[in-house]
């Protein structure tokens, strides 16, 4: 029993809370709702009678009291000519990924409606500036943007609509719009490309028998100096045209278009893409000047170059649309990637030459043969220097070794003056105490008469590098820069 009472109480409180919330919402809606304007044709005779007879409001009421906005001017007669012009407030940059651009414009339309001719007793100016709320009471062209993706009106602080009614029945409407328009891009020459973006104004429901759009004579599109981050747009490059379309089953529909020519500025891509990738390619060539057996230095340099170029390609691919054709930037990046990869392949070929046993043995044989030839030349020199008894012939040509020897000549008189006639020509570091009387090096004995032990380790053997490996590096130093320079000449002559 207690449980059922608790449930009933909970349900009752929930209903009361829901009712209170609904009342609060309805009161907020009532406060936020604007007062609805009634057209003169919708007002009662009593309301119209309250307006002073000689006032401007009364003149407007007289014009619109029998006006039907559902019927176009000159019904069943000549088509209505609507003169169109546009003032561009701002022009957004083109988005390559979505292939569109955004503009903020004042759209102005002017047509003649004989039903709105001001009466002859109107003593004011030649035009009436009418409140925008009256715009819905008039007939208006059903203009829409054929290549529009999204659009919106502006209503801060009031609806951005300007309405004029002229004495002869001309109606001028100006409204502020922000529109995102599609612009199919041809990126074959990207980033040295020039794009042509259209804005098409078309009638939605009226055929050419009822309505025609006409560009205003003179400058139908007014464009202030606009600075875009990536493009240059000039007033002289704007083109106008007619794009009247035929739809099967309904007929021809009037359409006018304006074409904007936008030339891309290459500076950003020169500094952000071309210069860094060029430097990476040049960096990969440094490996040709590094010793062929220094794989610890050459391999990381080549891998770094290839990975950096691949990363640049991936980053740019994410910022551009997925198109099926090759862009100019793709050609550059692929070429740079191939040059970086080729430098890595070049070192692989050098390593093959370096580790080829036949080439290594052939190089060792060549070196041994050269040393043998040098040895024979040394012996001949020695024979010319020392005679058969060991007597020096020309002491300045004695081979002074590193072995330090003990003095054995007891006095200078032991020297044969006829043999050492040019002692004065000895080098400064030549110590006579280390040589015997005939200029031959002798061993130095310790106190026990044993030769002094030499603990010096023999130097490590030099790696044998085949001549073919060195020749490949030598050719690469000239071939790679020449090929890259040739590619640059062809590339820039085509795309610039």
Curated annotation (Swiss-Prot):
It comes from Rattus norvegicus (Rat). The gene is Glrb. Glycine 1 binds at residues 108, 174. Forms heteropentamers with glycin receptor alpha subunits. Heteropentamers with GLRA1 can be composed of two GLRA1 and three GLRB subunits, or three GLRA1 and two GLRB subunits, or four GLRA1 subunits and one GLRB subunit. Forms heteropentamers with GLRA2. Functional GLRB-GLRA2 heteropentamers contain four GLRA2 subunits and one GLRB subunit, although alternative subunit composition cannot be excluded. Forms a heteropentamer with GLRA3. Interacts with GPHN. Its main location: membrane. It is found in: Postsynaptic cell membrane; Cell membrane; Synapse; Perikaryon. CDD domains: LGIC_ECD_GlyR_beta, LGIC_TM_GlyR_beta. Disulfide bonds join 183-197, 243-255. Glycine 2 binds at residue 250. This is Glycine receptor subunit beta. The modification Phosphothreonine is found at residue 391.
């Amino acid at each position: 029993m207690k449980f059922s009472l608790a449930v009933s109480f909970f349900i009752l409180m929930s209903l009361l809370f829901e009712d209170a919330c609904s009342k609060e919402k309805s009161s907020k809606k009532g406060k936020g709702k604007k007062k609805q304007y009634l057209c003169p044709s919708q007002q009662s005779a009593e309301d119209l009678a309250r307006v002073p007879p000689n006032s401007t409001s009364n003149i407007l009421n007289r014009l619109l009291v029998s006006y039907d906005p559902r019927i176009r001017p000159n019904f069943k007669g000549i088509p209505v000519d609507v003169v169109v012009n546009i003032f561009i407030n701002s022009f957004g940059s083109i988005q390559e990924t979505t292939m569109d651009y955004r503009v903020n414009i004042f759209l102005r339309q002017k047509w003649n409606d004989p039903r709105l001719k001001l009466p002859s007793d109107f003593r004011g100016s030649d035009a009436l500036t009418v409140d925008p709320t009256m715009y819905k009471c008039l007939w208006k062209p059903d203009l829409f943007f054929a290549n529009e993706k999204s659009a919106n009106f502006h209503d801060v602080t009031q609806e951005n609509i300007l309405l004029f009614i002229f004495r002869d029945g001309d109606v001028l409407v100006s409204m502020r719009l922000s529109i995102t328009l599609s612009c199919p891009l041809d990126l074959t020459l990207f980033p040295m490309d020039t794009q042509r973006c259209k804005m098409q104004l078309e009638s939605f429901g009226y055929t050419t028998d009822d309505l025609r759009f006409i560009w205003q004579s003179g400058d139908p599109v007014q464009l202030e100096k606009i600075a875009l981050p990536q493009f240059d747009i000039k007033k002289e490059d704007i083109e106008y045209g007619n794009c009247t379309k035929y739809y099967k089953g309904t007929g021809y529909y009037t359409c006018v278009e304006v074409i904007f020519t936008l030339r891309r500025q290459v500076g950003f891509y020169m500094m952000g893409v071309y210069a860094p990738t060029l430097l990476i390619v040049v960096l990969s060539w440094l490996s040709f000047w590094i010793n062929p057996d220094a794989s610890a230095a050459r391999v990381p340099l080549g891998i770094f170059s290839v990975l950096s170029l691949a990363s640049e390609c991936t980053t740019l691919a994410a910022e551009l649309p997925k198109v099926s054709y090759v862009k100019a930037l793709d050609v550059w990046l692929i070429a740079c990637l191939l040059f970086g990869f080729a430098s890595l392949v070049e070192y692989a070929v050098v390593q093959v030459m370096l580790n080829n046993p036949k080439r290594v043995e052939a190089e060792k044989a060549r070196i041994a043969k050269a040393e043998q030839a040098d040895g024979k030349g040394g012996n001949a020199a020695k024979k010319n220097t020392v005679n058969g008894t060991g007597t020096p012939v020309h002491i300045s040509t004695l081979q002074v070794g590193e072995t330090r020897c003990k003095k054995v000549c007891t006095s200078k008189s032991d020297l044969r003056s006829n043999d050492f006639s040019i002692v004065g020509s000895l080098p400064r570091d030549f110590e006579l105490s280390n040589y015997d009387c005939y200029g031959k090096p002798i061993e130095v004995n310790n106190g026990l008469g044993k030769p002094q032990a030499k603990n010096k380790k023999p130097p490590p053997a030099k790696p044998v590098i085949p001549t073919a490996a060195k020749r490949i590096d030598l050719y690469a130093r000239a071939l790679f820069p020449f090929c890259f320079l040739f590619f640059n000449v062809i590339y820039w002559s085509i795309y610039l």
